[in-house]
Amino acid sequence: MSEYRIKVAPNTVAYADAENHKLVVEFAIPGAPTATIDVKILEDSIHLTAPARDIEYVSALALAWPVKPEKAEAIYEHGLLRIEVPFKDPMEDAVKVAVKASGPDIKAE
């Protein structure tokens, strides 16, 4: 039989570091061994699970602005997990659309 842990939402702070164009998220997860922390990041969300003694920290955050998950960095120190991930340029994947004239072309002045 697997060990049951009570699921607990960690204290969380998330803010935009506008100067460095990054999202910073901090999770307070004291007692969680580094090797058991599981963080998954998508462009629009962050998911965390971290077992610690008789509890399991769990969190799922929906992000208002897309990020670049492949460039995320995470540091765990003194029970605080800090994640920094750059924001994605909203035009990064934009596709240029060719415009055709349907009548006489207007000349640029």
Located regions from the model:
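Alpha-crystallin/small heat shock protein
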Residues: 1-109
